Amino acid sequence: MNQKQYRLITNKIREYKYGVRLARFINRFLTEIVYVAFFALLIFMVIQKDKNIVRVVVVTGISFVLVSVVRHFINAKRPYTMYDFVPIIEKDKEGDSMPSRHVFSAFVIAMAFLYVNTYLGVFFLIIALLMAIERVIVGVHFPKDVIVGAIIGVVSGVIGFYII
């Protein structure tokens, strides 16, 4: 997306009476539902004495650290810093845009759910996709940032849960 497209989208959101409030709510809701559900999954696995909890924690934890290190070295600028506009979500970071850690996390957590329960996994893959779209619309990521985050999340999940 280019400067004109980002400004058009963010201005349209601002035009609606509750546009900004709704966009911020959706961002917070999608983020919190993923993390709260993941925590609930871990608690459930502990209660069930499910030995797969070790794999779930290790795969998600190691891949999260690796993505964090990679994005720090890439240090890609965010759309609002490159195109000089105010994003819908308040952010003050100039870099660390690629890959999107929110989207990566949502997808690797969705893969953890898929590993444990197919239906919940599909549900959280849909939530992760919605989060990816939302992160672009509110102006904090480029499409490539969320696509790469999603791919890394899915690949990490496939390798960690199904190949190794």
Residue ranges and their predicted role:
Residues 30-42, 123-126:
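Hydrophobic alpha-helical transmembrane segments
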Residues 47, 75-80, 139-144:
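Transmembrane helix-loop junctions in multipass membrane proteins, especially transporters and channels
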Residues 18, 43-49, 116, 161-163:
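Structural signal for the C-terminal ends of transmembrane alpha-helices
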Residues 1-36, 51, 67-95:
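N-terminal transmembrane-helix/juxtamembrane module of multi-pass inner/ER membrane proteins
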Residues 40-66:
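Interfacial segments of alpha-helical transmembrane regions
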Residues 64-68, 72, 154-161:
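Transmembrane alpha-helical segments of multi-pass membrane transport proteins and ion-pumping complexes
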Residues 58-71, 122-134:
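Small-polar-interrupted transmembrane alpha-helices in polytopic inner-membrane proteins
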Residues 84-164:
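Membrane-embedded catalytic cores of phosphoryl/pyrophosphoryl-handling enzymes
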